[in-house]
Amino acid sequence: MSGKENIRMQKSLFGTSGIRGDAQTLFTPQFCFDIGRTFIEFLRRHNLTDSIGVGMDPRESSPTIKSDLFKGLYVEGVELFDEGTAPIPAINWLIKNTSVKAGIMITGSHIAPQLNGVKFYAHDEEISFEDQTEIEE
């Protein structure tokens, strides 16, 4: 099964702010790998960038999710900027003020500790509903 097919099997990935769910059952190594690759495919269709910044919050599951995302991004040959543990606005600042024009923030924000989330940034902001729909397709 391809990464896209695996992602399509989910009902609706995106909620009001990125993808959120159980850190163990949703954010599996394969899912993180696939969503990383799929985001790069989206960026390339829009001629955006081949460099991407990735940050995370201090949740216990965040480093594993980041590592698995990095594997998918690395396979696509993009230049990776590891922002480490950072506040959510750090990725937005990065894409507005440097040559890096896309980003991913791994954050559960205010949700329960066993959950986590992934937010995607492009076009100088968090991706739009239309962008989310395109990524899911």
Where are these regions (language model features)?
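Gly/Ser-rich phosphate-binding catalytic loop and adjacent alpha/beta segment
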Residues: 2-137
